[in-house]
Amino acid sequence: MKIRASVRKICEKCRLIRRQGRIIVICSNPRHKQRQG
């Protein structure tokens, strides 16, 4: 899980989701997991 100021989709399988007021990227590739902090 990378914590970044700006999250973006890295590949076409990445999904942007809002959870508990945070924007999270989930993907089938675990390296693409990101959270906005």
UniProtKB/Swiss-Prot annotation:
Gene Ontology cellular component terms for the protein in this record: chloroplast; ribonucleoprotein complex; ribosome
Recorded GO MF terms: structural constituent of ribosome
SUPFAM superfamilies: Ribosomal protein L36
Places the protein is found: Plastid, Chloroplast
Database matches in Pfam families: Ribosomal_L36
Keywords assigned: Chloroplast, Plastid, Ribonucleoprotein, Ribosomal protein
Record GO biological process: translation
Keyword Ribosomal protein: yes
Family named by the database record: Belongs to the bacterial ribosomal protein bL36 family.
UniProt name for this protein: Large ribosomal subunit protein bL36c
Organism whose genome encodes this protein: Phalaenopsis aphrodite subsp. formosana
Taxonomic path: Eukaryota, Viridiplantae, Streptophyta, Embryophyta, Tracheophyta
